[in-house]
Amino acid sequence: MKFKPLGERALVKLVEREEKTASGIVLPDTAKEKPQTAEVIAVGDSEDIKVKEGDVVVFAKYSGTEISLNGDDYMILDADDILGVVEE
């Protein structure tokens, strides 16, 4: 199944964080913070959205709508909730 966001929205896949601390302690799922970085999978049809497919973005902590497509978890973010693009 394909999904195309509408307007100024982006479909993103969360970038998972390391499950161990720097000192080697393994974190249980309940102790992990919700990730705030994601890879952009698809963007809406608005010319005002400033991200493109493949960008890694940082987004506001309590934003977005979680959805499941083909057994994978994604989020739909409004462009206003995207705080910036990670550049390497």
Swiss-Prot record:
Keyword 4Fe-4S in record: no
Per the record, its GO cellular-component terms are: cytoplasm
GO terms of biological process kind = chaperone cofactor-dependent protein refolding
The primary location reported for this protein is: cytoplasm
Asked if Zinc-finger is a keyword of the record, the answer is: no
GO terms (molecular function) for this protein are: ATP binding; metal ion binding; protein folding chaperone; protein-folding chaperone binding; unfolded protein binding
Localization per record? Cytoplasm
Cited InterPro entries? Chaperonin_GroES, Chaperonin_GroES_sf, Chaprnonin_Cpn10_CS, GroES-like_sf
Q: Which UniProt keywords apply?
A: Chaperone, Cytoplasm
Q: Which domain of life is it from?
A: Bacteria
| Gene3D superfamilies according to UniProt | GroES chaperonin
Q: Pfam families in the record, alphabetically?
A: Cpn10
Return the HAMAP family for the record. CH10
* Function per UniProt: Together with the chaperonin GroEL, plays an essential role in assisting protein folding. The GroEL-GroES system forms a nano-cage that allows encapsulation of the non-native substrate proteins and provides a physical environment optimized to promote and accelerate protein folding. GroES binds to the apical surface of the GroEL ring, thereby capping the opening of the GroEL channel.
Outline the subunit composition.
Heptamer of 7 subunits arranged in a ring. Interacts with the chaperonin GroEL.
Which NCBIfam families does the record associate with it? PRK00364.2-2 (NF001531), PRK00364.3-3 (NF001537)
Q: Which family does it belong to?
A: Belongs to the GroES chaperonin family.
Q: What's the protein called, per UniProt? A: Co-chaperonin GroES
